[in-house]
From Swiss-Prot:
Physiological role: Forms the small spikes on the baseplate that plug the end of the tube before DNA ejection and form a channel perforating the host membrane during ejection. Involved in baseplate assembly.
Swiss-Prot/TrEMBL GO biological process terms: entry receptor-mediated virion attachment to host cell; symbiont genome entry into host cell via pore formation in plasma membrane; viral tail assembly
Pfam families assigned: Phage_base_V, Phage_spike
Name of the molecule in the record: Spike protein
Recorded name of the encoding gene: V
Annotated organism of origin: Escherichia phage P2
Length: 211
């Protein structure tokens, strides 16, 4: 190979070492994609991920995403794809200097904003946490808002201190221990108001059943 050819080959390799492009196809089963760069489309290339050993991550790039092509030795056939670069079609979803912000195609958002120390998850339909041992939340105040119902499906619920509730319905019986104080309303048992019902019979003897 003459000197001119060597220079041209070297220039080609240098041009190909780092290129930008747009993903045009993805093969999720193979973990590969094809990228349009300049006037050509690459072969199926692997994309880079955060971890790929004992701990592994998965976050597939999407069609239309702008990426870098990293070609070792300038050979595009064996290059790797590094997502992603903001573009006019896919601009930055946040302008915060410090926030971690993830926006998904369905509109769901996960964000942690250090300026307000606020973690926000919005736009999701369901959430599931499964633990084989326990789940602990330690916080001064917990607020749960449910428009329909909150279900505690467990053999036992323990409240270690005061319980305040607007209404209470017990369906399968139970026991109470300790002093009970009732004020501000009627307390009835089997249709009889306890503090107003009367008993027939002589006041000096055993009374009858409540009226």
């Amino acid at each position: 190979m003459n000197t001119l050819a060597n220079i041209q080959e070297l220039a080609r390799a240098l041009r190909n070492m780092i290129r930008t492009g747009i993903i045009v196809e993805t093969d999720l089963n193979a973990g590969r994609c094809r990228v349009q760069t300049g006037g050509m489309c690459t072969d199926w290339l692997q994309w880079l991920t955060h971890r790929a050993g004992r701990s592994r991550t998965w976050w597939a790039p999407s069609v239309g995403e702008q990426v870098l092509i990293l070609a070792v030795g300038g050979e595009l056939d064996t290059a790797f794809v590094l997502p992603g670069i903001y573009s006019g079609d896919n601009p930055s979803p946040s302008v915060s200097a410090d926030a971690l912000h993830i926006r998904f195609p369905d509109g769901a958002v996960i964000e942690y904003e250090p300026e307000t120390s606020a973690l926000t998850v919005s736009g999701i339909k369901t959430a599931s946490v499964t633990a084989s041992g326990s789940v602990t939340a330690t916080v001064p105040v917990v607020m749960v808002k449910a428009s329909t119902r909150v279900t505690l499906d467990t053999p036992e619920v323990v409240c270690t201190n005061r319980l305040i509730t607007g209404t209470l319905e017990v369906q399968k019986g139970g026991t109470m221990r300790g002093n009970i104080e009732h004020t501000g309303g009627e307390l009835s048992s089997n249709g009889k108001v306890l503090h107003t019902h009367k008993h027939p019979g002589d006041s000096g003897g055993t009374t009858g059943s409540p009226l």
